Amino acid sequence: MRLALGLSYDGRAYQGWQSQATGLTVQDKLEAALAAFANSPISTLCAGRTDAGVHGLMQVVHFDTDTVRDLSSWVRGTNRYLPSNIAVQWAKEVTSEFHSRGSALSRRYAYILLESPVRPSIDAGRVGWVFRPLEEQAMRQAADHLMGEHDFTSFRASACQALSPVKTIKRISIAKRGAYWRFDFEANAFLHHMIRNIMGCLIAVGQGAQSPDWMREVLMARNRKVAAPTFSPDGLYFLGPRYDANWGLPERSPAYDWLPL
């Protein structure tokens, strides 16, 4: 049978999602826990790979197994073997046609940014940080240039393995509460470091170092060297994929309510 799981994790302690020889990735920890619970090896596929230091509020994975357990047992049993900064939120049986990556209609991320003259303390590692004020309207105007289908080569890491740099951004929203900014992104898919590179450019515009129209110049250049430096992973959260409602999978986890705004 095929199962889908939703899980959340604090990415600070891990070298990203994808399995590595070190074993210090979220995928490695999850597969070890699943194998311990099911008493057999299990290989997972995820909806979206996250980089080192990036957090997940609702990563979705699927796997095939002959082990029969109640769905609630898959949640509680797997969590028993997981470290405290990773937790399975739900489990659901799906048909063999479901694919955590291939069935996703879009993917959603949020970036939480602290604007303060003093560096983060209690939220260190969970938020990005700027000490110069940001101008919201300028950032909104800059973000508008990125909406729709474009070649995002200028925002692509050199190590990116995507077959095409052409992606479609469906939504970018910017909001602020107190000292905290929240940037939401939704696209059909994202390139390696794409959001962190966009964040670097938005901050350059927000602080007045560049004009809003500079974002279009960066986009059209199709050259990573013309964009701002890659911003910190600390405040980046994978909110999860969107699927067709017919799959019956949750779109939220309780961790959503923890994020500001």
Question: Which sequence ranges carry the predicted segments?
Answer:
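Structured-RNA-binding interfaces characteristic of tRNA pseudouridine synthases
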Residues: 1-261
